[in-house]
Amino acid sequence: MTIESGALEQKKAKIESGYGTLATPSSTDAIRHLELQLQYKMNRERSPQKRGTPDHASSLPRRITAGFDLSSAMWEPSGTLGTASYFGPLLKAAFGTQTTPNLATTIASSSLTTGATLTSGTGLAVGDTAVLTIGTGARREITRLKSVAGAAVTWDAVSAAPNTPGAFVSGVNYKFASTLADSLSIFLFHTGGGYKEAVQGAIVDKVEFMFDGTKEATIKFSGPAKTRVRTGFSQPGAHTTVGSPASGLVGNFYLDG
């Protein structure tokens, strides 16, 4: 019998082709986490029926429930503009829409607090967020696009007109949709003992972001699932996550209300 020693769990998450259709995990579906549990309960109840002897009893089946709780993880960027982090599938399932303009351009002219003409507006859409460079101290502010007409764009007002030329960047955006259409298959592998399990039809019911000036940004996801399975899938040969592990308080976070 193999005894587990050390952190030998691997977790993977992948968007399903349809609700409850178990996805096929690959090495690049890997996620880094501090704590993640897959949940499953039979919900059987003791029968109220009287029996001839007190030492015999039966239980009644109920609806089986399943779910997942990613209760602790550091939110690490991919390190590449336009490339989602390894939590991309979970964030898309939580918000409903993911767009990737993947645009790093400059402000060409007509710079105002509410808009400008860009060198290029390729890939932008109304509702996308953008990071602008403002002032001599190269302060950065985030805003949301209100209109896009080629390279001419307007946005929610910022504190001052952006620099000309100044950087205009829009990477990965998540937007609320009226319908959350994506479900997930979430896999757990114990590499030492060969144990594996998964939940399919997982829905992100709750997501939390935590920001502290003295700590790394953390994120939580949780929600119900259709069911739990232990067969029908295999562990990929590698565990490859996007980007690099957190190595200090670096980078910026922008939130547009």
Regions found by a protein language model. Give the residues of each.
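Signature of extracytoplasmic/envelope-associated structural regions
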Residues: M1-G257
